[in-house]
């Protein structure tokens, strides 16, 4: 082994070291590029998922608002129907009483005169009954069973 062979070995080993360093640099560059690309894709995916979650949240809120509105509307319709039903029964009772009083006054030679007025949740009834020389005046205020 002479000096030529030893310098050839050192040149070869130096070339191998340079090539290994260069391959390592290329590999690190490729890995860095792949990692950055993966990071960009992950950021984009997280953004898409946040948008989808926001959309789902808005849709759930809108559905809740629609259901709540429907429940309130249904309750108000039921209350309206119930109050109207009671009001119609009360009016029917007033009409029946009026018919009987008129029939009675016609058959006893007296007369009944009166009126009724409905204000808000009150029924004001004013009746004047005359039978010959006797007279009776009735005024009554009845509160209707309307809940507010």
Swiss-Prot record:
Swiss-Prot/TrEMBL keywords: Repeat
Cross-referenced InterPro entries: IQ_motif_EF-hand-BS, IQCF
Gene3D superfamilies the UniProt entry points to: 1.20.5.190
Chain ranges of the IQ domain: 11-40, 67-96
Pfam families (UniProt xref): IQ
Cross-referenced SMART domains: IQ
Record's protein name: IQ domain-containing protein F5
Source organism per UniProt: Mus musculus
Source species taxonomy: Eukaryota, Metazoa, Chordata, Craniata, Vertebrata
Gene designation per UniProt: Iqcf5
